[in-house]
């Protein structure tokens, strides 16, 4: 298994697909990286030479924010909103939907399981 950006990527898959296992790299960025490095898109990970893996690793380190750095930045952005006390920060703090979705019904994923109300029957 090749290890890129702290992630063991699967060896049997094509390089473009395998790169998407890294947090922060989707299909579009994976194709960009492969094109920059000059590797054929249909090549599998186990067919890559050590030099090609090193080129991919350097391209990702140089041009993209991935894995821990990306997760930390996302968490810091949310924390900043919460510290500001703006509407989005309050919604994050209360564990409610942030982007204007309705909460009267639905929003169960964000709010968690429904709480039983004593004495309420159909």
UniProtKB/Swiss-Prot annotation:
PROSITE patterns: RIBOSOMAL_S13_1, RIBOSOMAL_S13_2. Keywords: Ribonucleoprotein, Ribosomal protein, RNA-binding, rRNA-binding, tRNA-binding. Located at the top of the head of the 30S subunit, it contacts several helices of the 16S rRNA. In the 70S ribosome it contacts the 23S rRNA (bridge B1a) and protein L5 of the 50S subunit (bridge B1b), connecting the 2 subunits; these bridges are implicated in subunit movement. Contacts the tRNAs in the A and P-sites. Residues 99-122 are annotated as: Disordered. Part of the 30S ribosomal subunit. Forms a loose heterodimer with protein S19. Forms two bridges to the 50S subunit in the 70S ribosome. Signal peptide: none annotated. GO terms for molecular function: rRNA binding; structural constituent of ribosome; tRNA binding. The keyword RNA-binding applies. GO terms for biological process: translation. This is Small ribosomal subunit protein uS13. One of its GO terms (cellular component) is cytosol. The gene is rpsM. It comes from Rhizobium johnstonii (strain DSM 114642 / LMG 32736 / 3841).
């Amino acid at each position: 298994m090749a290890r890129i950006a702290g992630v063991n990527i699967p060896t049997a898959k094509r390089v473009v697909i395998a790169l998407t296992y890294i947090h922060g790299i989707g299909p579009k960025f994976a194709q960009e990286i492969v094109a920059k490095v000059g590797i054929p898109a249909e090549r599998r990970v186990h067919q890559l030479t050590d030099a090609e893996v090193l080129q991919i690793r350097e391209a990702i380190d140089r041009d993209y924010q991935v894995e821990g750095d990306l997760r930390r930045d996302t968490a810091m952005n949310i924390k900043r909103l919460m510290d500001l006390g703006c509407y989005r920060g309050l919604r994050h703090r209360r564990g409610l939907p942030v982007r204007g979705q309705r909460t009267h019904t639905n929003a169960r994923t964000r709010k968690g399981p429904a709480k039983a109300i004593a004495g309420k029957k159909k």
